[in-house]
Swiss-Prot record:
One of its GO terms (biological process) is 'de novo' IMP biosynthetic process. This is Phosphoribosylaminoimidazole-succinocarboxamide synthase. Keywords: ATP-binding, Ligase, Nucleotide-binding, Purine biosynthesis. Pfam families: SAICAR_synt (PF01259). InterPro entries: SAICAR_synt/ADE2_N, SAICAR_synthase_Vibrio-typ. GO terms for molecular function: ATP binding; phosphoribosylaminoimidazolesuccinocarboxamide synthase activity.
Amino acid sequence: MSFADKVLAVNDNLPIRTDLPVHSGKVRSVYWLTEQDSRRLIEEHNYPVPKDTPLAIMLISDRISAFDCIWRGEEGMQGVPGKGAALNAISNHWFGLFKEQGLADSHILDIPHPLVWIVQKARPIMIEAICRQYITGSMWRAYEKGEREFCGIRLEEGLSRDSKLANILITPSTKGVLKGIEGVPEADDVNVSRSDIAQHYAAFNFNSADDIALYEKLLTEGFGVISHALNKIDQIFVDTKFEFGYVKDVDGNDKLIYMDEVGTPDSSRIWDAKQYDQGNIVENSKEGFRQLLLNYFPDPDILLNKERMDEREALARNNALPVQVLMDISKTYTQIAEKITGQKIVLSDNPKEEVISVLRDRYQLID
């Protein structure tokens, strides 16, 4: 059996019982359960939610996306072996730590399989909640061009690339295209200031202006928990993206929670601390794959320029990367997951059949 067989690339075609279209994202697919199945699972498994809460199966794939495109390899390799299991394992670990330390809950109610979450429906805050501890990436590119204001924050003079910032900075961007907000362009992933959010908090889906401070508190506290834990294993938590939303608690009241994934190599930059101390940047995140792509293709502007999206999509569609590139990414993801969780990431021989078997036999969600 080849490594290509161990990859779950297509994750939106499982025969899970649902009466709504499957939502297929870049990496995860969401199957909304029927009202009857949601109620049954809540009762059978004593999930701490109102009995009428909509539930979903969230199934992660091994696909790898970068620069808003999905990339594939030669020899039929349609993803990265072990990537999905590594991402879920890392998120599960951090969500567990958050709960231990009295931070907010997540949307996850159950974990039937390393690739599967059972989640409750959440109403998302329309913000990519980005937290930065070092100046790198898009912030550095803007700074290098002479920009000194980033998301409404004034940056001091004399900063150097990849250096640690004096304070952790919150630099949010829009989640999706938001319309009709003065001063905010109608485009995806646009940087916004705290002032933008405060003036239009309802448009960003906050229940109240006070909840802006709550999301910032949960963001910085969550960042701190992960950063402290990574320091213990000689890793640096450089920057990250969190997502938040509202769910109903068991009494039917709204509560703000963490959602999607947290502190993973997909949503964060993680550097090797010993190498950083020696003046080297060694990525233990998807940023290493992004840098490889920028160096691999002769015209990196295609990957960075949003106005060349058609060319970028053609580049991803028409170019199969060497298998070794994807295997190196697999090693990065599985090794950092094992360091963080202390548990080995085991590759399934047939992940799709495993998931079907669990959801059919233990949860009766497949006829």
